[in-house]
Amino acid sequence: MRCKFLGSFFLLFSLSSKGADCRDSGTVWGALGHGINLNIPNFQMTDDIDEVRWERGSTLVAEFKRKMKPFLKSGAFEILANGDLKIKNLTRDDSGTYNVTVYSTNGTRILNKALDLRILEMVSKPMIYWECSNATLTCEVLEGTDVELKLYQGKEHLRSLRQKTMSYQWTNLRAPFKCKAVNRVSQESEMEVVNCPEKGLPLYLIVGVSAGGLLLVFFGALFIFCICKRKKRNRRRKGEELEIKASRMSTVERGPKPHSTQASAPASQNPVASQAPPPPGHHLQTPGHRPLPPSHRNREHQPKKRPPPSGTQVHQQKGPPLPRPRVQPKPPCGSGDVSLPPPN
């Protein structure tokens, strides 16, 4: 009997001492948008436990009492059989200090614990990008609270930084790079193999060459356009010149026709001129003219004299030649009568 009493005394003393130790506050981390269980440290539910109370500040959020229905402030809370408090779908408003108190069946408080709940946003998958011109690699994460970035090359840890962006200038590319983003509620990682040429062209040189090529194409197109326009203008000018020449030639061809018609008119009016020439041996004699004597014919066949020198002015007679007067031969000496040639 005495041993049983001593055992009960030591059990109560140990429970009360544990409750005193649990008064020290602890920190619990929760992920935004996810659920969490607030565990009672160093506690195990037994038949001697009569009541478990969870309070946030001075507000009761959940209560377990033996032989009674559990009390829950809202559907976001749930008290489990082991006394833990479950919070569903955490929001930033759920952060704060939660106090848990445990009572025994005889009404003695055997445990009192304060838990500080902090809500963190989970990290997103990091991104790796690099620039070959300056041999720089950058690791970046877009989402997450209290993020720490860790960079590895192969199995070698290169550096760590507590921020969302980290840059590193490499010296070799013998192994792939791995970027790891972590916080107290999540972690994500990404690995990339960096490929760069041995000697990369500077960015300004690439931009300059591209701009020069565009200018060359522009001026080439402008030159071709000007040449085509000039050829078209020359072709139009040549066409106009050909039209002018053709109109002039047609005008010249039409000009002599009236003269030819005028010349043909007298010919048609003079039937004698239009007749066929007489046969050889037949001499056409004009009426009223007689053949000249032989002496006069010989005169006509004599060579003509040279024209007078240039100093003297020669008056040329216009129109047809005038008829010459008849020359009668002198009568022979001794004959008193003048003999006339017989009429034809």
From Swiss-Prot:
Single GO molecular function: protein kinase binding
An individual GO BP term: positive regulation of interleukin-8 production
In residue numbers, the region (CD58 binding region 1) covers: 56-68
| S-S bridge residues | 132-196, 139-179
Q: Which domain of life is it from?
A: Eukaryota
Keyword set for this entry? Cell adhesion, Cell membrane, Disulfide bond, Glycoprotein, Immunoglobulin domain, Membrane, Repeat, Signal, Transmembrane, Transmembrane helix
Region listing for Disordered, in residue ranges: 237-344
Q: What is its main location?
A: membrane
Give residue spans, biased composition: Polar residues: 259-273
What are its GO cellular component terms? Answer: cell surface; cell-cell junction; cytoplasmic side of plasma membrane; external side of plasma membrane; extracellular region; Golgi apparatus; nucleoplasm; plasma membrane
Q: Which residues cross the membrane?
A: 203-228
Domain Ig-like V-type, by residue range, is 23-121
Compositionally biased spans, kind Pro residues: 320-332
Chain spans, region CD58 binding region 2: 99-113
Per the UniProt entry, the glycosylated residues are: 99, 106, 134
Function per UniProt: CD2 interacts with lymphocyte function-associated antigen CD58 (LFA-3) and CD48/BCM1 to mediate adhesion between T-cells and other cell types. CD2 is implicated in the triggering of T-cells, the cytoplasmic domain is implicated in the signaling function.
Which residues point to the Extracellular side?
A: 23-202
Q: Where is the signal peptide?
A: 1-22
Designated name of the protein: T-cell surface antigen CD2
Q: Where along the chain is composition biased (Basic residues)?
A: 296-307
The cellular location(s) given in this protein's UniProt record come to: Cell membrane
Tell me how this protein assembles: Interacts with CD48. Interacts with CD58 (LFA-3). Interacts with CD2AP. Interacts with PSTPIP1. Interacts with FCGR3A; this interaction modulates NK cell activation and cytotoxicity.
Query: Which residues are on the Cytoplasmic side of the membrane?
Result: 229-344
Which InterPro entries is this protein grouped with?
Answer: CD2, CD2/SLAM_rcpt, Ig-like_dom_sf, Ig-like_fold, Ig_C2-set, Ig_V-set
The way this protein sits in the membrane is described as: Single-pass type I membrane protein
Question: What positions does the domain Ig-like C2-type occupy?
Answer: 122-202
